[in-house]
Amino acid sequence: MTTTKLLLVLFAALVAAACASTPIGSDSTVTEATAKQLSGDVPLPPGAVIKQQDTLVMSAASTWLGRISLSVSGEPQAVFTYFKDGMPASGWTLTSSSFSKTSLLTFTKGERVANIQMQGTSFGGNDVLITVAPAARPVNSRP
């Protein structure tokens, strides 16, 4: 009976350890190369972690389109303010903002629109989703 209990405890410990470990290469802290690629276009908070499995970036520099999923530490209001102030400093124009449980910021720059969605997590961090897409063009109506 003691051997069975010991095996159960060891098995539970292994399962807990496996759940707690992060697979290599799944997420990464924003590197200097990534920050440089997006520099001048979209500011990324220091220490932000890119969730690679939820991120898709097409093109580079100031013409990129896609989605960047981040995990950002700090108070939700501070993260909201970081993007609200940082995006215009990078040439984006704020078109709408809403601070709540799930906060939203919308910006335009040239032919692109950026939506930033932020939500606080239960562990004191923030999930941030930045989506950059082509701006909708008005349909020309013919008489």
Description of each model-found segment:
Residues T2-L6, A20-P143:
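An acidic-aromatic pocket/loop used at catalytic or ligand-binding sites
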